């Protein structure tokens, strides 16, 4: 079982984090049938941007089940308005983003995470999608990849959208496929055209993996 929810770099382990690390995540993995392929592509160290399609709120947990390193991820700023909820999701590696505007603070935090050699999990579609398509990726993920120079690891997932079908808990099979890191080295520009092309390649990579699930 892989671990999710390690605290931010330099912070001590909290009781809440320990609870999720040793109890919740293992229980989750034991209840749901998870089939993961391509784990040999997961890097053991160094910065990496993990990109995947987004179907449910529990998607970060699914990635954490097969990723052996702490994950940091963006969450919509509205979730940080409540003090108790804010403390909870921050302890799991989340930081806020304003999805309705260009968020320089979120970009700065993301670059800092990658500069520190950490793992940044991103859902470049921007919102949860319930259909069977991988939608267009926002160009911001391309900008982040090119500005940071961090490897980009594509992942496709399916099944999480059926975990609460019609508001009732379900036990669907969860499938994930991890692809090899993308080569974006030919995109030397730092402009909107290059960022859009990088985002397009990322989307195509995830869509290709999704078609193989």
Model-predicted segments: where are they?
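A short, well-structured juxtamembrane/interface segment
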Residues: 25-46, 184
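Secondary-structure boundary/capping positions in well-ordered alpha/beta enzyme cores
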Residues: 34, 69-70, 95, 117, ...
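Non-catalytic C-terminal accessory region of glycerolipid acyltransferases
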Residues: 2-15, 105-213
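Catalytic core of membrane glycerolipid acyltransferases/transacylases, capturing the structured
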Residues: 18, 22, 29-30, 44-101, ...
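N-terminal membrane-anchoring alpha-helices
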Residues: 1-33
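Residues at the C-termini of beta-strands that transition into short coil/loop
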Residues: 40, 77, 98, 156, ...
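Structural motif corresponding to alpha-helix initiation and N-cap regions
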Residues: 36-39, 82, 104-107
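A short, flexible N-terminal coil/short beta segment enriched in small residues
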Residues: 2-6, 42, 64-65
């Amino acid at each position: 079982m892989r671990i999710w929810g390690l605290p931010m770099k330099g912070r001590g382990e909290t009781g809440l984090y320990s609870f999720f690390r040793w109890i919740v995540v293992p229980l989750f993995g034991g209840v749901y049938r998870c089939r993961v392929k391509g784990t040999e592509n997961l890097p053991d160290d160094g910065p990496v941007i993990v990109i995947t399609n987004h179907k449910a709120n529990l998607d970060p947990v699914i990635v954490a089940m097969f990723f052996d390193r702490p994950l940091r991820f963006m969450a919509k700023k509205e979730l940080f308005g409540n003090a108790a909820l804010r403390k909870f999701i921050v302890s799991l590696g989340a930081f806020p983003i304003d999805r309705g505007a260009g968020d320089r603070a979120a970009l700065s935090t993301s670059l800092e995470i990658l500069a520190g050699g950490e793992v940044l999990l991103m859902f470049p579609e921007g919102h949860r999608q319930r259909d069977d398509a991988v939608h267009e990726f926002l160009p911001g993920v391309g900008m982040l990849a090119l500005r940071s120079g961090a490897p980009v690891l594509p992942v496709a997932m399916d099944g999480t959208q059926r975990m609460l079908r019609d508001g009732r808990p379900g036990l669907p099979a969860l499938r994930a496929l991890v692809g090899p890191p993308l080569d974006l080295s030919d995109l030397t520009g730092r402009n909107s055209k290059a960022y859009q092309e990088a985002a397009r390649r990322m989307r195509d990579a995830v869509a290709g993996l999704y078609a193989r699930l």
